[in-house]
Amino acid sequence: MSDIPNDSIMRWDEETRRFSVFRRPSNKSNGLTRDRQGRLIVCEHGARRLTRTEYDGSITVLMDRFESKQLNSPNDVVVKSDDSIWFTDPALGRQNNYTGYVDAPELPDHVYRLDRSGRAIVVAADINRPNGLAFSPDENKLYIVEYGVLPRSLRVYDVVDDGQR
């Protein structure tokens, strides 16, 4: 679980039924998930990047730029069964002091797909402040929360064979 104000990722221990710190600092982590190999995938608002925590605890930067421009504030993330990583990148984490970092975005709000080779593509560019995202159980639909306009909405996209939406 991410604890953005305390710059921490927390770990739940089922045996003791308590949380403990897994990583601090976490670069103001937000969205977390596991890849198909069980490694932790982290959206880091503060460092403006998507990372993977390896089994030995080291951190691999998966993506911090798109077309030579720095990401905004990766927000939420899901991994598809083909090992591609899909994540939202709204500017929202850079536009207020909640994360402690305020600056102008270099990119518009996007949803990205990062394939196993490390190639990234924009899969949604028409969403104002994309936030949470999830696949349908058969992975044929991608659901994305649009956070930036009222009323907030849930967008649904078809996912096509090449992994795009």
Positions of the model-derived regions?
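Sequence-structural signature of mature extracellular/luminal beta-sheet repeat domains
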Residues: 1-165
